[in-house]
């Protein structure tokens, strides 16, 4: 997606050969017009997939997920990272390791919102090692629902997440595929 690649070139900051900071438009400050374009593109890509729900992880996946849900006309569920007094009943949970934060979290979704008739689209801001995607897939499977596909805003293709998801037979659509961050320069797979 050219608009996204351009935004990454202009406002993304390469912190290391492994880390790309995009807090100017995606995961701290949000560019609503760009999020709308992202939602439109995911909706186009998954229009014929029979999606009934979208699942993401709080917080950075919420904006692109909501824009996609708006366009597809389906609800968005975000897996919570933190315990809530209102989120208590027999939760669907999975552990996820954050590459960027170097921490392990348990994410949870209420089983009231997912069931076996759902076809679920996973939306996330980044795909690196695939741990967040695998955690969401685990939760979807616990509910007996079907994974319709994964929509990734930015994929770090030089890490193993995409290959693992591909090998498991999941459809992955990434809007920007980063080949390398070497030398402080973002290189895309075209």
From Swiss-Prot:
SUPFAM superfamilies per UniProt: PRTase-like
GO molecular function: xanthine phosphoribosyltransferase activity
Transferase keyword on record: yes
GO BP of this protein: purine ribonucleoside salvage; xanthine metabolic process; XMP salvage
Binding site for 5-phospho-alpha-D-ribose 1-diphosphate: 128-132
Keyword annotations: Cytoplasm, Glycosyltransferase, Purine salvage, Transferase
InterPro entries, per the entry: PRibTrfase_dom, PRTase-like, Pur/Pyrimidine_PRTase, Xanthine_PRibTrfase
Protein name as catalogued: Xanthine phosphoribosyltransferase
Species annotation: Pseudomonas entomophila (strain L48)
């Amino acid at each position: 997606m050219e608009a996204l690649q351009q935004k990454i070139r202009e406002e993304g900051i390469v912190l290391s050969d492994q880390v790309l900071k995009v807090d100017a438009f995606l995961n701290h400050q949000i560019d609503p017009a760009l999020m709308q374009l992202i939602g439109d593109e995911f909706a186009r890509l998954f229009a014929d997939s029979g999606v009934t729900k979208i699942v993401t992880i709080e917080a950075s996946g919420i904006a692109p997920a909501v824009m996609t849900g708006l366009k597809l006309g389906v609800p968005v569920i975000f897996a919570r990272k933190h315990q809530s007094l209102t989120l208590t009943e027999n939760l669907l949970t999975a552990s996820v390791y954050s590459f960027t934060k170097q921490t392990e979290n348990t994410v949870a979704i209420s089983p009231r919102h997912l069931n076996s008739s759902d076809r679920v689209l996973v939306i996330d801001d980044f795909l690196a090692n695939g741990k967040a995607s695998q955690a969401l897939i685990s939760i979807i499977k616990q509910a007996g629902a079907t994974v319709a596909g994964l929509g990734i805003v930015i994929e770090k293709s030089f890490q193993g997440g995409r290959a693992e998801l591909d090998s498991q037979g999941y459809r992955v659509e990434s809007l920007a595929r980063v080949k390398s961050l070497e030398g402080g320069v973002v290189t895309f797979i075209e």
